[in-house]
């Protein structure tokens, strides 16, 4: 499995900040012109059982690819579930998202553009 190779390669130097916006609340309608928000569904059997060290290695690989690709693509955060990882990225287009996945050896089973975000505050 190609993805397994990512877990056993030597770790890249830790990049402390993959995205200038990481940890901040970002809404698609407030993005600069030409930037779009995407949710990437990555089917990874056993994802929820990955160790902290394995997740760190995956994050380091992703950040290394992002650094190589430049500031037009940014990783905001990811959600790890039983057999999937859902990642939120900013990029000018879906092709750049898929290029990142290919370069990092990550699956990108579905890439969906986010049109808006709702939360409990939406009900107020």
Task: Identify the function of each model-found stretch.
Residues 8-19:
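Bacterial N-terminal signal peptides
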């Amino acid at each position: 499995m190609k993805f397994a190779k990512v877990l056993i390669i030597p770790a890249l130097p830790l990049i402390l900040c993959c995205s200038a916006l990481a940890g901040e609340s970002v809404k698609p309608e407030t993005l600069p012109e030409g930037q779009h928000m995407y949710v990437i569904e990555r089917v990874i059997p056993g994802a929820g059982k990955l160790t902290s060290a394995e997740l760190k290695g995956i994050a380091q690989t992703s950040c290394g690819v992002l650094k190589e690709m430049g500031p037009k693509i940014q990783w905001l955060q990811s959600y790890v579930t039983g057999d999937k990882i859902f990642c939120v990225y900013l990029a000018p287009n879906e092709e750049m998202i898929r290029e990142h996945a290919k370069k990092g050896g990550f699956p990108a089973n579905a890439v969906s553009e986010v049109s808006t975000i709702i939360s409990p505050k939406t009900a107020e």
